[in-house]
């Protein structure tokens, strides 16, 4: 069965995270949360910040992580950056599957036992939540900024890119 559109789960409602009570809760699709040169210390830090309260599906998080990591590693080099995904998809999404097509009315139970089955995960985000951060050297500032801009395109919320560390090193670039 095809994936439902993300707009079905975008709005924040009540959280549903207790996996010990949920049979068949799916694992997360996000493969890595820390990428690049994890041990080095970089002077400039940029962060992608959410502007609205939404649920971000794990598919969108993984797509944003992949596109940002690929862009920075190819342009700046594998040892010249550190990238961290700062949110985790704890919230479990449920779907009440409905039968469609000819004869569906004979098979369907309607809204009886309509709680739904787990189909995926999402991260719950409030305004001002840091989604993703990149640490780089001052000469790779523009590359990191473009990587976060590309990652923002995968998000279901408006975002902003904030320079959290290294303002003094970026005179004329900000």
Curated annotation (Swiss-Prot):
<dbReference type="InterPro" id="IPR018255">
    <property type="entry name" value="Ribosomal_uL16_CS_euk_arc"/>
</dbReference>
<dbReference type="InterPro" id="IPR047873">
    <property type="entry name" value="Ribosomal_uL16"/>
</dbReference>
<keyword id="KW-0687">Ribonucleoprotein</keyword>
<dbReference type="GO" id="GO:1990904">
    <property type="term" value="C:ribonucleoprotein complex"/>
</dbReference>
<dbReference type="InterPro" id="IPR022981">
    <property type="entry name" value="Ribosomal_uL16_arc"/>
</dbReference>
<keyword id="KW-0689">Ribosomal protein</keyword>
<dbReference type="GO" id="GO:0003735">
    <property type="term" value="F:structural constituent of ribosome"/>
</dbReference>
<dbReference type="InterPro" id="IPR036920">
    <property type="entry name" value="Ribosomal_uL16_sf"/>
</dbReference>
<dbReference type="GO" id="GO:0006412">
    <property type="term" value="P:translation"/>
</dbReference>
<dbReference type="InterPro" id="IPR016180">
    <property type="entry name" value="Ribosomal_uL16_dom"/>
</dbReference>
<dbReference type="Pfam" id="PF00252">
    <property type="entry name" value="Ribosomal_L16"/>
</dbReference>
<protein>
    <recommendedName>
        <fullName>Large ribosomal subunit protein uL16</fullName>
    </recommendedName>
</protein>
<comment type="similarity">
    <text>Belongs to the universal ribosomal protein uL16 family.</text>
</comment>
<dbReference type="InterPro" id="IPR001197">
    <property type="entry name" value="Ribosomal_uL16_euk_arch"/>
</dbReference>
<dbReference type="GO" id="GO:0005840">
    <property type="term" value="C:ribosome"/>
</dbReference>
């Amino acid at each position: 069965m095809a994936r439902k559109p993300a707009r079905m789960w975008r709005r924040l409602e009540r959280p549903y995270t207790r996996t010990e009570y949920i049979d068949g809760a799916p694992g997360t699709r996000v493969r890595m949360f820390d990428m690049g040169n994890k041990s080095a210390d970089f002077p400039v830090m940029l962060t992608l910040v959410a502007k609205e309260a939404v649920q971000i599906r794990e598919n969108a998080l993984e797509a944003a992580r992949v596109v940002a990591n690929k862009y920075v590693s190819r342009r700046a080099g594998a040892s010249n950056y550190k990238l961290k995904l700062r949110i985790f998809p704890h919230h479990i999404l449920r779907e009440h599957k409905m039968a469609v097509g000819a004869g569906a009315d004979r098979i369907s139970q309607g809204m009886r036992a309509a709680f739904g089955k787990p189909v995926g995960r999402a991260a719950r985000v409030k305004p001002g939540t840091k989604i993703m951060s990149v640490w780089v050297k001052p000469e790779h500032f523009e590359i990191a900024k473009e990587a976060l801009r590309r990652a923002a395109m995968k998000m279901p919320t408006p975002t902003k890119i904030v320079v959290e560390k290294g303002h003094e090193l970026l005179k004329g670039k900000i």
